Amino acid sequence: NAEPDVLTSGKSLGGGKASISAYTCKEKIFKKSYDNLRDATLHSTTFNALGEETMTAIEAINIIIEDNYLKKSKEIFNILNPGLIELKKKYPNIISDVRGSGSLNGIVINTDFTDKYFLPLIKLIPSQFTKDDYAFKKIVVSSIISELYDTHKILTFYGSNIDLPLKISAPIITKKEYIDYFLSSLDKTLSMGLIKLITKFIKK
């Protein structure tokens, strides 16, 4: 139930048409930061006050409110998150954490392999990739992404933070049967085991 003092937004604010972002904060924060001649323009940008982008953003906000995107994202979360938690219980050696809120969720994949399994696989990886400190972690997550796409036609991606979570970004129009299909497909994919998934991915 945290209430932020500062909120930034972008991407969907442009309604898929305009490039626009916004910075919103509480009045007391705004006054403390900008309510003087020296700092009054600190929050401005080179490209601002463009009428078409502003109108697009206003209409995007209207649609978000009128179509109740918040309710829809919560409905997605209430199906997807428990399903991911169940998969974590089923595959505790593969999924180390479940994260997210609304329609954006993710699972952290355990990449803590022993040398017994790691060393034979590392020999299959092209040398230019092994210079990246996160190379093996990326390959592990990418092997799951690849299988989900090739076999089940599901597009996922990994995040950019240190844990490189497998991100599931469900469209707001997603129906329950699609979420169920995703969870079933992820279950089938993880049941193959990471060693088989990684070997298949590297060979491909």
What positions do the PLM features span?
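Conserved N-terminal phosphate-binding loop of PLP-dependent enzymes in the Aspartate aminotransferase
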Residues: N1-K204
